[in-house]
């Protein structure tokens, strides 16, 4: 039976001393849910898994319920197939990630049903500091490192729409 590779992005773990989960425990949690070849990456909740299941909605429900029960917090995840991730990388705007000495780059992954078009309505950019671009499945955000403290990206964290987003940085060429 063919297996599918997925990237699972957890929201709000190991941030600000809340929802602390060791990566070995997180890996064991995914394995207990029946996923194979589980690999965690850094402490912010990036997990690669394999599954024979192709129903993303069912997988999201399974993962959120399983993690919520095992780790006693309301788990929220963004699930991205290998094909979708390749599309997100390919759809990045020209030059995105090309000058990591001058700019900080972030990809804002969206939890369905939030669309990039709708998410962009909540994203403010500060002229001369920030740039934002809506792709097909994610938002791409860059800001000048020298002026990062005046960036508007942090404003999104206080908005209700942020509950359906997760931001990952270091997305470079």
Regions found by a protein language model. Give the residues of each.
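Surface-exposed, charge/polar-rich loops and edge strands
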Residues: 2-44, 48-173
């Amino acid at each position: 039976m063919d297996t599918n590779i997925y990237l699972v992005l957890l929201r709000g773990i190991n941030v600000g001393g809340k929802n602390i989960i060791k990566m070995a425990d997180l890996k064991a949690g995914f394995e207990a849910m029946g996923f194979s070849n589980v690999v965690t990456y850094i402490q912010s909740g990036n997990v690669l898994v394999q599954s024979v299941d192709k129903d993303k909605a069912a997988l999201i429900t399974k993962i959120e319920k399983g993690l919520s029960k095992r780790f006693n917090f309301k788990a929220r995840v963004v699930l991205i197939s290998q094909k979708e991730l390749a599309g997100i990388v390919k759809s990045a705007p020209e030059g995105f990630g090309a000058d990591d000495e001058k700019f900080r780059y972030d990809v804002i992954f969206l939890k369905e049903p939030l669309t990039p078009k709708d998410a962009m309505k909540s994203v403010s950019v500060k002229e001369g500091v920030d740039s934002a671009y809506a792709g097909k499945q994610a938002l791409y955000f860059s800001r000048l490192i020298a002026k990062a403290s005046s960036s508007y990206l942090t404003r999104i964290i206080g908005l209700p729409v942020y509950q359906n987003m997760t931001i990952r940085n270091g997305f470079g060429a």
